């Protein structure tokens, strides 16, 4: 939130001066939706709508095969990619095909599905509630794990006729995986391997801007941010991405705005794609979800949402305090990639997480990587993606 406010203030102070600054060639994907971004590079694209048990309608995107293997008959192994906090399906296809995990997996022979969590740009529909109502936004990552993930996985498996899939999560995408697979053995059985990028469970040691949010008293937090959407993806973000961040003089401001959230990594950031990143991010979430992360910073625990009073927790959980999520109960094989310069998924929190995983098959800590490098770094294929493809290939043998 803070980087956006700084950027807006900068525009206000500068007036229309930025119009006279040097222009970088714009990437057309900055003005596209998910299907258009996929098709732009010559890949097949499908959009499906998943209805969760509690009525949310999520757009899920499919790349059924790569550009050059359309005629290969037979089922392809299924991979489901789940974005992180404030992200969307675009996170997996925002770079050139050779640098985007969604495209790389399709070209490697996989049936690729891109998920969206309730409340982001591509998941703002409900059977009964309008996004204008507070009821629509009454959710956190608890509900994403309880409803979104199972509904989406079951939909994908029904559609493809397969019994299991590979699950790749980034950031909050790993969080909901940890919850869902540890609390639902039936769902866990449908996962071949869990590939966790920048994994987040506890955030006791985080150095991200969540620390600043945690300092705001609860009552003041609700006054400032309301009770609906946090960090909406609006015309302003697209304007910043398409117009402002494609100016040579201002692209450094945009880059540092992103790094302020996640940690600095100058050598890996592809400045030529900055307008695409900013145009599609942040994709939004609920204020309640942000409150849940704020609670996690303050408590240092990996637990369900605290409703604020013992009697309220009793109503939801049949106990006066929020239940702790038991990471040791997850038996899904898991491969982990973490970063030593990650302000959100701090190495100390990652170490705690690793100590609780009963079926860890691989771990790699990448020097100088930050939280967003796992989806946008120019060397992500060498550091992460090729290893994911190799591990998945083992399942084919």
From Swiss-Prot:
Record comment: activity regulation: Inhibited by diethylp-nitrophenyl phosphate but not inhibited by thiol reagents 5,5'-dithiobis(2-nitrobenzoic acid) or 4,4'-dithiopyridine.
Sample GO molecular function, one term: triacylglycerol lipase activity
Catalytic activity: a triacylglycerol + H2O = a diacylglycerol + a fatty acid + H(+); 1,2,3-tri-(9Z-octadecenoyl)-glycerol + H2O = 1,2-di-(9Z-octadecenoyl)-sn-glycerol + (9Z)-octadecenoate + H(+); 1,2,3-trioctanoylglycerol + H2O = 1,2-dioctanoyl-sn-glycerol + octanoate + H(+)
Chief place where the protein resides: secreted
Subcellular location: Secreted
InterPro entries reported in the protein's UniProt record: AB_hydrolase_fold, AB_hydrolase_lipase, Lipase_euk
Active site (catalytic residues): 171 (nucleophile), 342 (charge relay system), 371 (charge relay system)
GO cellular component: extracellular region; intracellular membrane-bounded organelle
EC identifiers of the protein: 3.1.1.3
Family: Belongs to the AB hydrolase superfamily. Lipase family.
Protein task: Catalyzes the hydrolysis of triacylglycerols to yield free fatty acids, diacylglycerol, monoacylglycerol, and glycerol. Shows a preferential hydrolysis at the sn-3 position of triacylglycerol.
Official protein name in the record: Gastric triacylglycerol lipase
Name of encoding gene: LIPF
